[in-house]
Amino acid sequence: MLTILTILTSFIFSQNDCTDGRYIEEIFNVDVQYGIEYGENINQNILGSDFTQTLFMDIYSPENDDFEDRPLIFFMYGGSFISGSKSSPDIVALCTKYAQRGYVAVAIDYRLSPVLIFNANEEVAYKAVLKAMHDVKAAIRYFRMMDESSPGTYKIDSNRIFTGGVSAGAIAAVNAGYLDQYEEIPAFLLDDYDELGGIEGLSGNIGFDSSFHGIV
C-alpha cells in the first residue's frame, strides 16, 4: 500500500539498525554520478513539433558506504512543467542531504511541456503531468533492471523506493503513485493515457516493475 510520508525515517527505522546515525544524521560524504541515461521518449518543443528526448538522471550516494540495501528516493524539480532542471539548487540540496544520511537519492530530468506557455488548456496540462509520471516510472524501472542484471551496482533496496518533488515535481510524484491502475483513470483522460502509453508509458525499461512505496 502506498503511503504519504511526512517523516520518512519513521518507516526506515522499522527496517534497519540506525544506531550509527544512519538515516538521521549527516554522517557521509556524497558521491554523485552525473548524466546517467535512463530512457528516452517523444516530446514536443515550444512550437509543438515532435522530437526524441533522451532522459538523464544524477545519482547521489553515500561515499564509502558498504551497506548493500539502501532506500532509494527520487526528487523531481519544479517549474510549472515548462522549465526547470535536475540541477536546480533545491533539488541538489535535497539529494545531497538525503545521501549524507545514507539514502541513494536521484534527481531526474523529465519531459517538460513549454507549449503550455502559449496553450494552457486542460488537455495540454494533463498531458504534461502524464509525461512526467511516465518518466519517473521509467527511472524506477531502470534501477530494478540494474538490480536484476548487475546486482549491487547501486546498492539499493528495491522494496524501499520513494518519490517526492518540489511544486510541479511534487504533483507528478503524487499522481504517479495514485493513478496506477487503469480502472482508476477518469474517463476524460483515457484517450490521453492511450496516446502516451497507458499507465506505464514508453520512456524505457519496459517489463520491469515501476511501483514504489511512499511519497515524501
Could you tell me what each predicted segment is?
Residues 27-29, 49-52, 66-68, 98-100, ...:
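Extracellular/periplasmic catalytic domains that process cell-envelope and extracellular macromolecules
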Residues 68-79:
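Short beta-strand element of the alpha/beta-hydrolase
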Residues 91-95, 129, 133-136:
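Amphipathic alpha-helical segments in well-structured domains
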Residues 15-68:
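N-terminal cap/lid segment of alpha/beta-hydrolase-fold proteins
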